[in-house]
Regions:
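Nucleotide-activated donor-binding/catalytic signature segment of Leloir-type glycosyltransferases, i.e.
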Residues: 222-238
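Conserved acidic donor-binding segment of nucleotide-sugar-dependent glycosyltransferases
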Residues: 290-291, 295-302, 311-316
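Short alpha-helical donor nucleotide-sugar binding micro-motif in glycosyltransferases
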Residues: 237-238, 245-250
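Conserved donor-binding/catalytic core segment of Leloir-type glycosyltransferases
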Residues: 10, 171-189, 194-200, 211-213
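Aromatic "clamp/platform" in nucleotide-sugar-dependent glycosyltransferases that forms part
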Residues: 258
């Protein structure tokens, strides 16, 4: 039952069961108790499965959203790019027609390419019109503030980084040469380049192991990984205590993506003091500083990827230093509790109600 004195937020985004970054962010909100501070109702607009299943879920979600909208003060719409943008634009329009305050939460690392290369000028005008409907517009980092600020102006934009629950510190073993990857297993995440550098690293460091945690989206890449199965281990999608165990046991984390928003997996690796190798895309430079909290590789470039991984494999002291610095940065800048305080301040700024603090 809703309490009349509390802020009422209707949130829409991928179903919480979906394997992906936005669902992870939403689940972190629930784990941290956001639903106890406000009256929060979450509607999953997308599920994994067949096209028919996805279509039925989208229709069901929209009907549910329309039925609940009159009872809520704020509609918080989580959006990426491409099909996600088209789905969520319908929800945004409905909320404005119902005279509700709208928070648009932009997560899509591929939005610049979608906006600049895939849309006509007419399509870009539509995007600007939809995005301008937000009473508040949340982005993941400074690069996104600049990009979306050029489209809709910066007045209503707030930087709200992704955040996680920081685990209790544990003694970590470095020099074990265990590399962890977590995320979608596809070309855009740099999996092809990662698999390409592994044979050379295996020659230099015979005990090296690469653990791939995710769902395959490319059968050709999966076949390449299976050919290296002696030292490339396919974990499937992992979560909960199993994910935490690998984050603790692996001394190196790698994410060689072509583009990103702000990957939660990098935050999790930081919080677990991993030596990190990733690419300078999206909001990753807000998290990783070269030579301080991690190392960079150039997207699509096997040379720099192999060199950065080799540096950490060769130097456990460097790995320990980078991991320790990353852990401290995660504690001070990416704690879920601080993130929720910022989110509640955004809600309060556009609503007449106040959150309830237990």
């Amino acid at each position: 039952m809703m309490r009349e004195d509390r802020m009422r937020v209707l949130m829409a985004g991928p179903d919480r069961s979906v394997h992906g970054g936005i669902s992870g962010v939403v689940n972190n909100y629930y784990d941290a108790g956001l639903d106890r501070m406000i009256d929060l109702c979450y509607i999953g607009t997308m599920v994994e499965g067949t096209k028919l299943r996805k279509l039925l879920q989208a229709v069901k979600a929209y009907i549910c959203f329309l039925s609940k909208l009159p009872h809520y003060d704020i509609a918080h719409v989580n959006m990426a790019s491409d099909s996600s943008y088209y789905r969520k634009s319908v929800f945004i329009r409905a909320a404005k027609l119902c005279r509700r305050k709208v928070v648009i939460h932009q997560h899509g690392g591929n939005f610049p390419e979608f906006y600049e290369k895939e849309l006509s000028e007419r399509g870009r005008r539509r995007v600007r019109r939809i995005l301008s409907m937000g009473d508040a517009f949340l982005v993941l980092g400074t690069v996104w503030m600049d990009f979306f600020g050029a489209i809709i102006g910066k007045e209503r934009i707030t930087v709200l980084p992704n955040a996680i629950r920081i685990p209790e510190p544990k003694e970590k073993q470095y020099g074990v040469h265990k590399i962890l990857y977590m995320g979608r297993l596809c070309k855009a995440k740099g999996i092809g380049e990662l698999l390409a550098v592994m044979p050379g690293l295996k020659e230099q460091y015979p005990d090296v192991r690469l653990y791939l945690a995710g769902i395959w989206e490319d059968t050709e890449l999966k076949a390449k990984a299976e050919a290296l199965k002696d030292y490339v281990i396919d974990l499937g999608w992992i979560g909960g205590t199993q994910k935490q165990r690998y984050l603790e046991e692996c001394d190196i984390f790698v994410l060689p993506s072509y583009f990103e928003g702000q990957p939660v997996s990098v935050l999790e690796a930081m919080a677990n003091a991993c030596g990190i190798v990733t690419t300078k895309t999206g909001s990753i430079p807000d998290m990783i500083i070269e030579g301080d909290t991690g190392l960079f590789a150039v997207p699509r470039d096997t040379k720099t990827l192999g060199e950065s991984l080799s540096r950490l494999l060769a130097d456990s002291d460097l790995c320990r230093t980078l991991g320790g610095n990353a852990r401290r940065k995660a504690e001070t800048e990416f704690s879920i509790d601080n993130n929720i305080k910022k989110l509640l301040a955004v809600y309060e700024a556009i609503s007449c109600r106040e959150p309830h603090h237990e």
